Amino acid sequence: MAIEGVLNEGFVTTTADKLINWTRTGSLWPMTFGLACCAVEMMHAGASRYDLDRFGVVFRPSPRQSDVMIVAGTLCNKMAPALRKVYDQMAEPRWVISMGSCANGGGYYHYSYSVVRGCDRIVPVDVYVPGCPPTAEALIYGIIQLQAKIRRTNTIARKA
């Protein structure tokens, strides 16, 4: 958190935007939407070697309790409405991480008739994590990029 000034009396001053965004970056609660082999790497990122808890990332079982969706794997046409329904059940503000080549653009199965060529056709994506499958380090880097994106957003509406 960038602090504009520290007074001698023990007060810290900052903008409300920076305070709210700082708290949001430290408490990301993703809902896993693991569809294929990328989900295994997502599980590795939550295990003890990488430990996403130190970033404030705690996996939640319900979309109503989460603010981040990690789409990991091949999205087929039959699963696309379910993805959209789960996304709509998430509370605002919400973010989406597209993990892996299949979620990003169809991947190896791009020309199949039953595969959606990127989950960004169904839900708005904030961060793309490349790879087939991407490593746990790549997912952690994607989460850090999402935290940087959240820090740059304006949360309080300004009068024009």
Curated annotation (Swiss-Prot):
Bound cofactor: record note:
Binds 1 [4Fe-4S] cluster.
Please state what the protein is called.
NADH-quinone oxidoreductase subunit B
Entry binding sites for [4Fe-4S] cluster? 37-38, 102, 132
Q: Which proteins does it associate with, and in what oligomeric form?
A: NDH-1 is composed of 14 different subunits. Subunits NuoB, C, D, E, F, and G constitute the peripheral sector of the complex.
State which Enzyme Commission number(s) the record gives.
7.1.1.-
> How is this protein positioned relative to the membrane?
Peripheral membrane protein
Question: In which family does this protein belong, per the annotation?
Answer: Belongs to the complex I 20 kDa subunit family.
